[in-house]
């Protein structure tokens, strides 16, 4: 509303919008909304909430991203605020899913179930997310920054991230 009344600078709004996980689209008056699902994990209720968001505010399609998130296209600008509140009601956020921030922390898609994993890395990914989200240092980076956790030697994603961590257990000797 404040943007439409000229009370907010367009560049300030763009920076704020990106930090909130919202991209403008080429089409007028619609946005792309991206969630931030730490390590790609969610509950059944959260998945149902995402499905409801797609039906209510988007075009009914949940796009799965390479960072283990979902994004929704064609969300009307006037629906974004209510949609974000609906997500928050289920413990979901879009905060820092876009822009020059620490992007979603990913983990091996088999974390917690892989027979070859050294240990489940998902709790470590979630801890890093919880520490970094809304942290002053991560709000205005020169570029997006990506972190990934792998639980076994077969996890191939760690080497292609800014920080890639693979599980290891070392003896103290």
Predicted regions and their residues:
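Small-residue-enriched alpha-helical segments and adjacent helix-cap loops
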Residues: 4-8, 30-172
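Acidic/polar, glycine-rich intrinsically disordered N-terminal extensions of enzymes
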Residues: 1-27, 139
């Amino acid at each position: 509303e404040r943007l439409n009344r000229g009370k907010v600078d367009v560049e300030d709004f763009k920076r704020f919008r990106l930090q909130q996980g919202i991209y403008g689209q080429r089409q007028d008056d619609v946005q792309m909304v991206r969630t931030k699902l730490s390590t790609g994990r969610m509950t059944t209720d959260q998945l149902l909430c995402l499905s409801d968001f797609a039906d209510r505010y988007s075009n009914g399609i949940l796009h799965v991203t390479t960072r283990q998130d979902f994004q929704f296209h064609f969300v009307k600008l006037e629906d974004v605020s209510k949609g974000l509140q609906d997500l928050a009601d289920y413990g979901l956020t879009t905060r820092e899913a876009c822009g020059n921030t620490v992007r979603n922390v990913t983990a091996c898609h088999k974390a917690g179930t892989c027979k070859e994993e050294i240990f489940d890395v998902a709790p470590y990914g979630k801890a890093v997310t919880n520490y970094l989200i809304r942290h002053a240092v991560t709000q205005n980076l020169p570029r997006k920054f990506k972190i990934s956790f792998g639980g076994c030697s077969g996890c191939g994603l760690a080497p292609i991230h800014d920080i890639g961590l693979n599980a290891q257990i070392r003896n103290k000797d």
